[in-house]
UniProtKB/Swiss-Prot annotation:
Chain segments annotated as coiled-coil in the UniProt record: 125-193, 236-438, 507-575
Modified residues (Phosphoserine): 3, 17, 19, 211, 292, 367
Disordered, as annotated region: 1-73
N6-acetyllysine carried by residues: 21
Name of the protein described by the UniProt record: Cytoskeleton-associated protein 4
Length: 575
């Protein structure tokens, strides 16, 4: 019995060793171990039968008690052996079941550990990918900062170019003001000369021929009409130039306002970039919180990459536009330099023309000394030359409007004409002195009449020249004054001339021819000056066209910058 109990206790302890996971087998072993002590108690119920004879029964009872104890011991021994075998079987069976269950549990735990390890590996890989994405975003932010730096440099360059254009506009405005002043001065001088000519004509009207008086009046009316037309043209040019200056000022003011707005936008973009950098630093510290929004972040990164690619393309287009603008400005500066060089060469050309004029004067004097008695042929040749000059000066008449643009330089030619008119006045005074010393004769009167007729023809030719050159009244009026004074003095002194002074009279006629040839050379010089002024006006028009193209490029640049600002704001909102 004790052995059975010990075995039952061992079986119970052996089955309870995997008690954490196999509680039911150990419970069954304990129940089996507890049942054997109940088996020997079954023969005890006959004991309570009361004996009839206590003494005999006591003797019989002792013998029967020993026999029953022996049988009970034998049966208990066999039962204990059987129970031990059963218990051993159950113990081994429980051990095998516990080992199988523990193996299955260990396998399950290993699978869970592998799954957890794979999850940790995926998480670390996602974390590395997220770190690489953040590094790429940092690099993109740095590239954005670099692009913003280049953008600021471009803005500074555009501001410098705009300052240069403003300076050029101011210089043009000052030159236009100077031109307007010169034109006003020229207008006053023309009006003064016209009034002086009217007074001279009124004084000479009493002494002159009636036909000459009528022609002079017609010429004066035509001259006043041409002067009024020129004055109207000058005022229109002044109004147009002032209007263009006001428009340029308004455009410059609008550009300055847009420049201020752009500078504010650049400052806001800088602040936004700084905020983006701060947010990126905070996001690096909050990597664990970004696991849930990893997919959305990847999609945002893809869209941002596409937008950055488009932004890079737009930046390249912006660089190309800036390069084209720079080339246009360089071409404009080169054209301005060439125009300045051509304007600096104008005084040398004028000086050279003056020297050629003096040489022509000397040659004309030498040729006229040898052709004293060939005055009629010379006058015919002079008329043909004047007709040729009229055909040539038709081109000048077509370029009068372009000359008005460069009237500042035309004033120099007018000043030279005034100086030449003074020289003509001096020569006229010399002629008057020569005529005052002369006498009268019939031959001399006929020569004077022929001279008057030739002068009338010359005045008719000069009328056409005045219609084509309305800016040159001083020279023609001085020539008319010479002719009128010569005719009046010849008419007053025609009857008291001595015949022996005929050669002196011819010399005065030669002097008159020389003065006419000098007028012709002066007209040629004026034609060359007008051609140079036309070329200069064409250059000015090309410069104005270049300025307009530069303004158009600046407008395109402003539109590109506005689009770039919109793209950057969209990127900032998405970040």
């Amino acid at each position: 019995m004790p052995s059975a109990k010990q075995r039952g206790s061992k079986g119970g302890h052996g089955a309870a060793s995997p008690s954490d996971k196999g509680a039911h087998p150990s419970g069954g072993a304990d129940d089996v171990a507890k049942k054997p002590p109940a088996a020997p108690q079954q023969p005890q119920p006959p004991a309570p039968h009361p004996p009839q004879h206590p003494q005999n029964q006591a003797h019989r009872g002792g013998h029967r008690g020993r026999s029953s104890a022996a049988t009970a011991n034998a049966s208990s021994a066999s039962c204990s052996r059987r129970l031990g075998r059963v218990l051993n079987f159950l113990f081994y069976l429980s051990l095998v079941a516990a080992a199988a269950f523990s193996g299955w549990y260990v396998h399950h735990v290993l699978e869970e550990v592998q799954q957890v390890r794979r999850g940790h590996q995926d998480f670390s890989r996602q974390r590395d990918e997220l770190g690489q994405g953040l590094q790429g975003v940092e690099q993109k932010v740095q590239s954005l900062q670099a692009t913003f730096g280049t953008f600021e440099s471009l803005l500074r360059n555009s501001q410098h170019k705009q300052d240069l254009t403003e300076k050029a506009v101011k210089e043009g405005e000052s030159e236009l003001n100077r031109i307007s002043e010169v034109l006003q001065k020229l207008q006053n001088e023309i009006l003064k000369d016209l009034s002086d000519g009217i007074h001279v004509v009124k004084d000479a009207r009493e002494r002159d021929f009636t036909s000459l008086e009528n022609t002079v009046e017609e010429r004066l009316t035509e001259l006043t009409k041409s002067i009024n037309d020129n004055i109207a043209i000058f005022t229109d040019v002044q109004k147009r130039s002032q209007k263009e200056i006001n428009e340029v000022k308004m455009k410059v003011a609008s550009l300055e306002e847009s420049k201020g707005d752009r500078s504010q936008d650049v400052k806001t973009l800088k602040d936004a970039v700084k905020e983006v950098q701060a947010s990126m630093m905070s996001r690096e510290r909050d990597i664990e919180a970004l696991k849930s929004s990893l997919q959305t972040m990847e999609s945002d990164v893809y869209t941002e990459v596409r937008e950055l690619v488009s932004l890079k393309q737009e930046q390249q287009a912006f660089k190309q536009a800036a390069d084209s603008e720079r080339l246009a400005l360089q071409a404009l500066t080169e054209k301005l330099l060439r125009s300045e060089e051509s304007s600096s060469r104008l005084p040398e050309d004028i000086r050279r023309l003056e020297e050629e004029l003096q040489q022509l004067k000397v040659g004309a004097h030498g040729s006229e000394e040898g052709a004293v008695f060939k005055d009629s042929k010379a006058l015919e040749e002079l008329q043909r030359q004047i007709e040729g000059l009229g055909a040539r000066l038709q081109y000048v008449e077509d370029g009068v409007y372009s000359m008005q643009v460069a009237s500042a330089r035309h004033t120099e030619s007018l000043e030279s004409l005034l100086s030449k008119s003074q020289e003509y006045e001096q020569r006229l005074a010399m002629l008057q002195e020569h005529v005052g010393n002369l006498g009268s004769s019939s031959d001399l009167a006929s020569t004077v009449r022929s001279l008057g007729e030739t002068q009338l023809a010359l005045s008719s030719d000069l009328k056409e020249l005045k219609q084509s050159l309305g800016e040159l009244p001083g020279t023609v009026e001085s020539l008319q004054e010479q002719v009128l004074s010569l005719l009046s003095q010849d008419q007053a002194q025609a009857e008291g001339l001595p015949p022996q002074d005929f050669l002196d009279r011819l010399s005065s006629l030669d002097n008159l021819k020389s003065s006419v040839s000098q007028v012709e050379s002066d007209l040629k010089m004026l034609r060359t000056a007008v051609d140079s002024l036309v070329a200069y006006s064409v250059k000015i028009e090309t410069n104005e066209n270049n300025l307009e193209s530069a303004k158009g490029l600046l407008d395109d640049l402003r539109n590109d910058l506005d689009r770039l600002f919109l793209k950057v704001e969209k990127i900032h909102e998405k970040i």
